[in-house]
Curated annotation (Swiss-Prot):
CDD domains: ATP-synt_F1_beta_C, ATP-synt_F1_beta_N, F1-ATPase_beta_CD. The keyword Membrane applies. Disulfide bonds: none annotated. Its EC number is 7.1.2.2. Belongs to the ATPase alpha/beta chains family. It comes from Synechocystis sp. (strain ATCC 27184 / PCC 6803 / Kazusa). This is ATP synthase subunit beta. GO terms for cellular component: plasma membrane; plasma membrane-derived thylakoid membrane; proton-transporting ATP synthase complex.
Length: 483
């Protein structure tokens, strides 16, 4: 959404280099950095051209260099460039819910214009230090494995690692559903440089699972902002900021708790790297932009808790060639409060959500924050699962009978814990037929303490699979014994 105030400040294109253009303006009328420019004119076929660009550099000699937010096909030297006098601004508020937008805040779902309302510029300062909520607070998700072993921080940033088909999208949708029902919050999804098909699938799955109400979009729980792989690097570089700006409105004006999903944070860095060389910057390590730390920091520092509300961010992280020392993921890790790692092995066993209880981490899992009961239970669960992992080779070669009585008990409890970490999801009801369960943190701790204490050693392990709290497991166990 780029409003042209008055066509008073008009320049001319002097050079087009792929997605980057140079434009010359009258003396004393140079646009500011980050101002939106609108290229107007007709291409060689006589068709109207309307391309929005963002000023990145002032070159001297009354020239600026700008990055295009859409294809520069058809642009030629001498075309008019209008300075809009302001940065790219996007619609915000409840009118954005249930809709799909591009980087400029224009709806791309063929459902007509967004109801007229407020707009915010995508470049905004991070909240002031005095406005921040510095007391660490756990963000309860209702998902047992996350709340117990990798608790999320309210206003924190979590990296979501996982390959294709292990359930990233389903976990995202469940979190969106739970924050809407339990916290009265909303979500914003930023699709940064991912496949168009995935964006389309996500939208359709959200309609199926009632996260989006196609008939009454205002009753939806999420706004979607897409800048896919086929978009120019300028759009992929800025679409994350568009999504973040929409989330900031819900936090600062509506005073809500917001979930911001960014899929994929690596593509944001990659787009910046593509543009950097065209802007004439000297590349740094592995060919990345020299401003890598600043680019990531500018985005991440705006994602935080204030005294009014919070933005909790879940960011899918692609690790190039599985190299965690690559500058892009390494820079991202510095900002994360926790990591949720999805395991293909668990998914193959049918244990969903397939969160790896030993690989996933959280800075919140400290006795001073979550309390000693939660901390001790989580650590005991992890040590039991770790011991089970160590014993698996012996079991595979010699069988269970060769284990000591104590180890056999550990294996038995670990298998129950593994199954109890699974849970039926609300958004998967239409596929599984099992009603979804939201499990409070207190019930989660109570359940795992009972398993660890040996109170449920007599129940079959199948009783713990895909249930909510421990009472449900007991009831299922009693039914299995009867049957």
């Amino acid at each position: 959404m780029v409003a042209v105030k008055e066509a008073t400040n008009v320049g001319k294109i002097t050079q087009v280099i792929g997605p980057v253009i140079d434009a010359q303006f009258p003396s004393g009328k140079l646009p500011r950095i980050y101002n939106a420019l609108k290229v107007q004119g007709r291409n060689s076929a006589g068709n109207e051209v309307a391309v929005t660009c963002e000023v990145q550099q002032l070159l001297g000699d009354n020239q600026v260099r700008a990055v295009a937010m859409s294809s520069t096909d058809g642009l030629v030297r001498g075309m008019d460039v209008v300075d809009t006098g302001a940065p790219i601004s996007v619609p915000v508020g409840t009118g954005t819910l249930g809709r799909i937008f591009n980087v400029l805040g224009e709806p791309v779902d063929n459902k007509g214009p967004v109801p007229a309302g407020e707009t915010f510029p995508i470049h905004r300062p991070a909240p002031k230090l005095v406005d921040l909520e510095t007391k660490p607070q756990v963000f309860e998700t209702g998902i047992k494995v996350i709340d117990l072993l990798t608790p999320y921080r309210q206003g924190g940033k979590i990296g979501l690692f996982g390959g294709a088909g292990v359930g990233k999208t389903v976990i995202m949708m469940e979190l969106i559903n739970n924050i809407a029902i339990q916290h009265g919050g909303v979500s914003v999804f930023g699709g940064v440089g991912e496949r168009t098909r995935e964006g389309n699938d996500l939208y359709n799955e959200m309609i199926e699972s009632n996260v989006i109400n196609a008939d009454k979009p205002e009753e939806s729980k999420i706004a979607l902002v897409y800048g896919q792989m086929n978009e120019p690097p300028g759009a992929r570089m800025r679409v994350g900021l568009t999504a973040l700006t929409m989330a900031e409105y819900f936090r600062d004006v509506n005073k809500q708790d917001v979930l911001l999903f960014i899929d994929n944070i690596f593509r944001f860095v990659q787009a910046g790297s593509e543009v950097s060389a065209l802007l004439g910057r000297m590349p740094s390590a592995v060919g990345y932009q020299p401003t890598l730390g600043t680019d990531v920091g500018d985005l991440q520092e705006r994602i935080t808790s204030t005294k009014e509300g919070s933005i909790t961010s879940i960011q899918a992280v692609y690790v190039p060639a599985d190299d965690l020392t690559d500058p892009a993921p390494a820079t991202t890790f510095a900002h994360l409060d926790g990591t949720t790692v999805l395991s293909r092995g668990l998914a193959a066993k049918g244990i969903y959500p397939a969160v790896d209880p030993l690989d996933s981490t959280s800075t919140m899992l400290q006795p001073s924050i979550v309390g000693s009961e939660h901390y001790d239970t989580a650590r005991e669960v992890q040590s039991t699962l770790q011991r089970y992992k160590e014993l698996q080779d012996i079991i595979a070669i010699l069988g269970l009978d060769e284990l000591s009585e104590e180890d056999r008990l550990t294996v038995d409890r670990a298998r129950k814990i593994e199954r109890f970490l699974s849970q039926p999801f609300f958004v998967a009801e239409v596929f599984t037929g099992a009603p979804g369960k939201y499990v409070s943190l207190a019930d989660t701790i109570k359940g795992f303490k009972a398993i660890l204490a040996g109170e449920l050693d007599d129940l079959p392990e199948q009783a713990f699979y895909l249930v909510g709290d421990i009472e449900e497991a007991k009831a299922k166990g009693a039914k299995l014994k009867e049957g």
